Amino acid sequence: MTRDSPDSNDSYKHINKNTTQKTSFDRNSFDYIVRSGLAGGISGSCAKTLIAPLDRIKILFQTSNPHYTKYTGSLIGLVEAAKHIWINDGVRGFFQGHSATLLRIFPYAAVKFVAYEQIRNTLIPSKEFESHWRRLVSGSLAGLCSVFITYPLDLVRVRLAYETEHKRVKLGRIIKKIYKEPASATLIKNDYIPNWFCHWCNFYRGYVPTVLGMIPYAGVSFFAHDLLHDVLKSPFFAPYSVLELSEDDELERVQKKQRRPLRTWAELISGGLAGMASQTAAYPFEIIRRRLQVSALSPKTMYDHKFQSISEIAHIIFKERGVRGFFVGLSIGYIKVTPMVACSFFVYERMKWNFGI
């Protein structure tokens, strides 16, 4: 007994020391930011690749592409649109614009998750500061940060997906085309703004409704995900929904102040429901944004060189289809967003765990 006790104590101290060294970290450190950014970028890329075919069809519906307007409004139309793409372009047609999507989504998702972690850590430094509005604000601000940095790539992606006239659409040609399009008359009239900057602003067509839509979208997405995590970790669900950890993993989790990980099915459900809630809240703004992004290609604006405003686009949509016009493609949106957000949050949480953050 006397011989075993010191050994046991030494062993315990050794393990405890190693664990402390391994797990001590600063959430504001460069290492943490890089790891969380990498986890976010990978999760976003996985999610977007999963739903790329649905994303292509949704963009064609949202932008009222003349070749696809007859298919809108029903799930049967979705199948018919998919057949049309398959016959004309094959498998490649479903992934048209996907290279631009990946170029955009990796930095977008990386910035979004990093910003969320940092803003949340600032607004909610400890459990007593936890509140619904702080969660909502953290998500909204994270979304605004990411969309500002990556918006031009999103515009290019939409244009690539919108094109149906050419079998092979080149990224460089689309970028040149957007830059050479007529710039905003308001900017052109200002003598102090250089001409190149006016045309660069073409890459921010639809940016304002994007920002307006991002506030509810990102805010509701992160808020709903966190809220559902709380529900699924409640005493009623916890025995079925929370992943069982070994003693060492549990000790490490506590020291790092990590959330208890959910089982796969629970994580996917919380992510999917969060995505549906955020999609519903922000969808009208997304419709306006998509129409603004392709407004320069519309026959009605091709010759008068008019840079349309949000109110003008909203009026056109309402005149064409009424209130339903602001929710065109929402059923596809639900089909798309459920697996996308579920996959995104699931991969992010698992990547964080594997990266030791």
From Swiss-Prot:
Keywords, ordered alphabetically: Membrane, Mitochondrion, Mitochondrion inner membrane, Repeat, Transmembrane, Transmembrane helix, Transport
InterPro entries given in the database record: GDC-like (IPR002167), Mit_carrier (IPR002067), Mitochondrial_sb/sol_carrier (IPR018108), Mt_carrier_dom_sf (IPR023395)
GO molecular function: coenzyme A transmembrane transporter activity
Gene3D superfamilies: Mitochondrial carrier domain (1.50.40.10)
Family listed: Belongs to the mitochondrial carrier (TC 2.A.29) family.
Segments traversing the membrane: 31-47, 103-119, 136-153, 208-228, 269-285, 325-347
Protein's UniProt name: Mitochondrial carrier protein LEU5
Gene source species: Saccharomyces cerevisiae (strain ATCC 204508 / S288c)
UniProt topology in membrane: Multi-pass membrane protein
Domain of life: Eukaryota
Cellular localisation: Mitochondrion inner membrane
Single GO BP term: mitochondrial coenzyme A transmembrane transport
Functional note: Required for the accumulation of coenzyme A in the mitochondrial matrix.
Solcar repeat spans: 31-122, 130-231, 262-354
CC terms in the record's Gene Ontology section: mitochondrial inner membrane; mitochondrion
